[in-house]
Amino acid sequence: MTEVFTADTTIDRSVDVVWARLIDRDSATRWMPGVDALRAQDPTEIGTTLIFTTRGKERTGQIAALNPGRSITLRSVQGGVTAGYVYTCSGYGDRTPVRLLADCSMTGPVRLLSPLIRSAIRRADSGQLDAFAATFTRE
């Protein structure tokens, strides 16, 4: 997979509070651009399928890796594009650094469009952590 972007922020809350919001599916629409709904029928664990609605269409992703309280990796495959989003929390008292690493790979004819697709992903999602941090200031 090729890195698309990395984003970092620090939130003035404990890692437990930040982590709880990060994995709260109901709050995802507040900070994931273009996501109108996010649901899953299973608990937050490796292999859980996530169903999200974006631009009027249902799509699926999966929890590919999980270190509770520390990191979660969401992976989705749409056509020949596989995207991975790794969210990492590092707790230090009442301040929690959070990092998002987005990467993707492409197969088949869509590979010809890889620079455009990576640019679109970067443009759409590189502000996720700023939006996520803002959910704490709106409390």
PLM region spans:
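Hydrophobic ligand-binding cavity/cleft-lining segments
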Residues: 1-39
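A short, structured loop/turn motif at beta-sheet edges
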Residues: 12-16, 65-69, 88-97
